[in-house]
Amino acid sequence: MKNKQEWFHEKTEKVSPEIMIEVQLSADIIARIDLLLKEKNMTQRELAQKLGKNESIVSRWTTGFPNFTLRTLSQLSVALGEPLIQIADH
């Protein structure tokens, strides 16, 4: 029987590098949202209200791997008062 690491490695070695990067970026953004919510002592409900969105949408963002649009990232940055992502200088 395979352990979890072997199973995970077997599944991920078949995934394209582009998808792996996409999943990692989504996970990083979700982690940043969670961190900012905690730092600002803000709930998902409060964030949803600031965005004018349903709380279930915010919940789905933080529990899955959403394909965030630039507009959504911008709206989240404004609502949280800090940038979610930064582009490295050349």
Language model regions located:
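DNA major-groove recognition helix of helix-turn-helix/homeodomain DNA-binding modules
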Residues: 71-86
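Recognition helix of helix-turn-helix/homeodomain-like DNA-binding domains
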Residues: 51-67
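Short, charged recognition helix plus adjacent turn
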Residues: 88-90
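N-terminal flexible/basic segments that precede or flank functional cores
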Residues: 1-35, 39-40
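Short basic helix-loop element that most often maps to the first helix and adjoining turn
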Residues: 31-50, 75
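Helix-turn-helix DNA-binding elements, focusing on the entry/boundary residues of the two helices
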Residues: 44, 55, 70-73
